[in-house]
Amino acid sequence: MSKEIKFSSDARTAMMRGIDILADTVKTTLGPKGRNVVLEKSYGSPLITNDGVTIAKEIELEDHFENMGAKLVSEVASKTNDIAGDGTTTATVLTQAIVREGLKNVTAGANPVGIRRGIELAAETAVASIKEMAIPVHDKSAIAQVATVSSRSEKVGEYISDAMERVGSDGVITIEESKGMQTELDVVEGMQFDRGYLSQYMVSNTEKMVAELDNPYILITDKKISNIQEILPLLEQILKTNRPLLIVADDVDGEALPTLVLNKIKGVFNVVAVKAPGFGDRRKAQLEDLAILTGGTVITEELGLDLKDATLEALGQAAKATVDKDHTTIVEGAGSVDAISDRVAIIKAQIEKTTSDFDREKLQERLAKLAGGVAVVKVGAATETELKAMKLLIEDALNATRAAVEEGIVSGGGTALVNAIAALDKLSEEGDIQTGINIVRRALEEPVRQIAANAGYEGSVIIDKLRSEKVGTGFNAATGQWVNMIEEGIVDPAKVTRSALQNAASVAGLILTTEAVVANKPEPAAPAMPPMDPSMGMGGMM
């Protein structure tokens, strides 16, 4: 396929047109009075959203050069979303502002390499200032404030803060679609895995069809139990303690299962058998997690252990185990705190190293089951369109909250970015490097200008007043009042704010130093078929 090439200002100007189209679409959603954007989908109802990265990903432009500019800004939004989970619209606004001011100077004869160095230096300094401003987040009310600002909903703020309070910062919070119209929070404490009892005759509560074991021993093995003789010595030891037994094994079949069921029905002892969770290496890891949580040992040939030789010391213990037809939940395992902490540290290290999103998700689930719990926010709405929009809002709020817990919070509404300008006053460079610093200085005001504009105010007037206000005071676009942003609960996660600036500066610098753009030439349209002569092709018909 032949290529089309543009150079110098022609290339940068073409990309800038694409950047403007995407950014102008996305930035209308910024702030408490931001508007929605309607996205046409290939099937189903349109999606109504104010999520920056979702909008950016949908935009495809006909002109290849413009489309490349748009895609570079979309990449900024995606990168910010991957790192911080929110702040995608802010990142888009910052990128547009830096590139726009940078192109003016490059067109006027400035050296783009010098400007890029100035942009990078200014961004690095502003990021350090944002980190210094950050206030640690620990209490539930601060978490609720972050979630409320991100989602523009106090109700969502309550759900997220309740979930984080109950499962902890290491817990997993998932978002699902509810079957009803109400949004609900469901929390599972302890370790739960998706395996149920192997026989319904093992239930102790026939009304709920649930097997409940109080203070049980837990046999954990990767072996298949087919012969009751394999575990008979162990069963005799457990019988003397008069405590129930939960068996977690690769499978229980053959004569072993009916023998266990018969003894359960006769009341000889209380036993429930379930299959081990997961498959392959993940099964092995989950069984080890379960053993550490309950203070037991995985009975496996890899360690030279045999079921016939197992003693009570090899069994795990817990305060309670509940088993239904699909799930097993173990609460208050008897494992040592130190062993669990060591295991948590290992899993966290694996999360840091992995490059697979799927592996990361599974590792986080394991971490939650050991260190916290699992909370499920079930989103309900009157229509499918509203449900999709609500789900995106809650996902953003959840990501913002996690980022806040990780690196703290700063004044919201773009105020922290304007406050960071003071740190740039300490930088004194020459020539084009100083020009790059001044470009970032101007760009840091842009989110506040846009938030004000979306709320119907003149951005320049708001910025002029904000410059004279003390640090931390900002403009509440929702009410039109000047307030202490932190005290008012208008806050942003520091991680979101600094990620937006870092990613915007990085891509803007690359665009400004671009000297040539190579795009595929549009394919010429295929010639239309000539109309058919009526006298041809039908001659055989009378």
Swiss-Prot record:
It catalyses: ATP + H2O + a folded polypeptide = ADP + phosphate + an unfolded polypeptide. One of its GO terms (molecular function) is unfolded protein binding. ATP binds at residues 29-32, 86-90, 413, 476-478, 492. It comes from the Bacteria. GO terms for cellular component: cytoplasm. Keywords: ATP-binding, Chaperone, Cytoplasm, Isomerase, Nucleotide-binding. Forms a cylinder of 14 subunits composed of two heptameric rings stacked back-to-back. Interacts with the co-chaperonin GroES. Belongs to the chaperonin (HSP60) family. This is Chaperonin GroEL. The gene is groEL.
